[in-house]
């Protein structure tokens, strides 16, 4: 049976329209898929610890180099050339705060060497007081927190006793931090104390909301090629994060994925053992940032 010309025209136009819509729909779907696949910027930032790459840079050099290489945050490690120490006067603290702000560099934290495992109570009390001094400095210059560290287990008492001692010593530090609007970050540190299960026990022994963990990207984090078991164990307390040589074989892509998963929106801080002059340091940091961006994607 022949189809009238007007009906043939209608069917042809309808078919063309359907094909056109289908094609456009396919293009839109492909565009949406492409857009979905595009890597998004991580919620966390990249900064550096002055240990050890900038250990011999003065404050002027730090504030010149970091913005040039695209780093936004710094953790000032004690004893380094920058001179950011609890001995600073009120006026000097205000000046440092202003200079960093003017340079666009956020003072993320202060790296102390306070530790709390000594068998001598007076030594422990001294470290607590030093931590409080650093917390006051952090408050005065606008830093978020102070890094401390466990650095060993006593040999004269059971392990659990040393862990309880460290946790208990952190409580007055946390109380001081709360009063100042700052935090205490316990670095996953020490040949014995860096074991994630021991760090978890220290956090539980402390139990103060202003005391958390500074993830330290240690080889001991890795279990059967993955950091996931260690990360999940410590995730509730992670408040800061140190990262090291990105070529080391440590599963950094997995770490950054895990940080995304817990909505970590703070800072990952470069911590390298080598001391470099500003020219070579600037070059290294540029390459480091590019590789960090790729691993975060």
Language model features with spans:
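Conserved beta-strand positions in the central sheet of alpha/beta enzyme cores
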Residues: 75, 109-111, 147, 242, ...
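Extended hydrophobic secondary-structure segments
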Residues: 70-82, 184
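Active-site acidic/histidine proton-transfer and metal-coordination neighborhood
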Residues: 14-22, 33-40, 60-67, 97-109, ...
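Glycine-rich, proline-tolerant flexible connector loops at the mouths of alpha/beta enzymes
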Residues: 77-95, 151-156
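Histidine-acidic metal/acid-base catalytic patches
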Residues: 2-47, 54-72, 193-297
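A generic secondary-structure micro-motif detector
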Residues: 51-52, 85-86, 124, 163, ...
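Short glycine-centered, acidic/aromatic-flanked micro-motifs in structured strand/loop junctions
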Residues: 50, 78, 114, 150, ...
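Residue-level preference for long, well-ordered alpha-helices that form the structural scaffold
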Residues: 89-92, 120-123, 127, 159-162, ...
């Amino acid at each position: 049976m022949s189809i009238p010309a007007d009906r043939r025209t209608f069917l042809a136009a309808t078919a063309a329209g359907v094909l056109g819509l289908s094609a456009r729909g396919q293009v839109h779907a492909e565009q949406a898929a492409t857009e979905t696949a595009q890597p998004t910027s991580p919620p966390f930032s990249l900064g550096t610890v002055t240990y050890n790459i900038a250990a011999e840079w003065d404050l002027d050099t730090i504030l010149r180099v970091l913005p040039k290489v695209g780093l936004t945050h710094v953790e000032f490690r004690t004893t380094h050339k920058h001179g950011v120490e609890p001995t600073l006067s009120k006026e000097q603290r205000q000046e440092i705060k202003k200079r960093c702000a003017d340079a666009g560099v956020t003072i993320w934290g202060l790296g102390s060497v306070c530790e709390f495992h000594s068998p001598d109570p007076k030594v422990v009390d001294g470290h607590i007081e030093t931590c409080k001094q650093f917390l006051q400095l952090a408050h005065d210059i606008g830093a978020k927190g102070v890094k401390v560290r466990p650095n060993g287990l006593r040999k004269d008492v059971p392990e659990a006793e040393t862990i309880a001692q460290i946790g208990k010593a952190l409580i007055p530090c946390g109380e001081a931090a709360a009063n100042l609007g700052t935090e205490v970050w316990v670095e996953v540190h020490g040949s014995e104390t860096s074991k994630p299960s021991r760090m978890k026990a220290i956090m539980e022994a402390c139990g103060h909301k202003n005391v958390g963990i500074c993830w330290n990207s240690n080889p001991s984090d890795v279990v059967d090629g993955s950091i996931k078991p260690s990360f999940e164990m410590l995730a509730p307390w992670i408040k800061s994060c140190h990262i090291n040589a990105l070529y080391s074989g440590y599963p950094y892509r997995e770490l950054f994925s895990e940080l995304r998963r817990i909505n970590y929106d703070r800072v990952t801080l470069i911590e390298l053992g080598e001391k470099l002059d500003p020219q070579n340091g600037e070059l290294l940091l540029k390459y480091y940032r590019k590789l960090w961006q790729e691993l975060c994607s």
